């Protein structure tokens, strides 16, 4: 959180809980949950009904498949305030604010975000220069 606004949710690889837990508020445009079920537990076959939804902000979920990644957080005015380290198996949902990444080790990430992707438009993202390495403040978990 930054100034009471939830910018990201990080789930570390060693996270453990029973049953199902959602980390996101119900009104988030992207939902992130964790499930732990015993052998033999059944999730009944189902489908998701067509429901018109409005998406105003792109939210990204990144799964760190391998390596080590630094994520840098900025407020909505592009002012840097802290960084976190993500390791193999960690998951992050990027909700609001600005963010950038630096690979600390060779890394693989799987990304999930809302679509449709419109490469011809490219108005969903604005780029700016990253914070200098000597200004980085790593926040420990």
Region spans (language model):
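Double-stranded beta-helix
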Residues: 100-141
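A short, N-terminal "cap"/entry segment at the start of jelly-roll beta-barrel domains
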Residues: 1-36, 136-141
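Conserved short histidine dyad/triad with adjacent acidic residue
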Residues: 34-56
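A short, compositionally biased micro-patch
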Residues: 38, 64, 87, 94-95, ...
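Glycine- and acidic-residue-biased ligand/ion/polar-headgroup-sensing regions
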Residues: 38-39, 57-74
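Short acidic-glycine-tyrosine-enriched beta hairpin
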Residues: 75-96
């Amino acid at each position: 959180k930054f100034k009471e606004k939830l910018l990201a949710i990080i789930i570390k690889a060693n996270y453990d809980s029973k049953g199902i837990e959602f980390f996101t508020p119900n009104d988030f445009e992207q939902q992130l949950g964790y499930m732990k079920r015993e052998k033999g537990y059944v999730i009944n076959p189902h489908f998701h009904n067509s429901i018109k939804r409005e998406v105003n902000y792109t939210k990204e979920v990144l799964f760190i498949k391998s390596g080590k990644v630094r994520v840098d957080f900025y407020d909505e005015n592009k002012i840097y305030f802290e960084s976190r380290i993500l390791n193999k198996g960690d998951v992050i949902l990027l909700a609001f604010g600005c963010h950038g990444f630096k690979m600390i080790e060779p890394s693989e990430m799987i990304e999930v975000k809302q679509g449709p992707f419109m490469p011809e438009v490219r108005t969903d993202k604005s780029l700016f220069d990253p914070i200098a390495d000597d200004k980085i403040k790593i926040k420990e978990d």
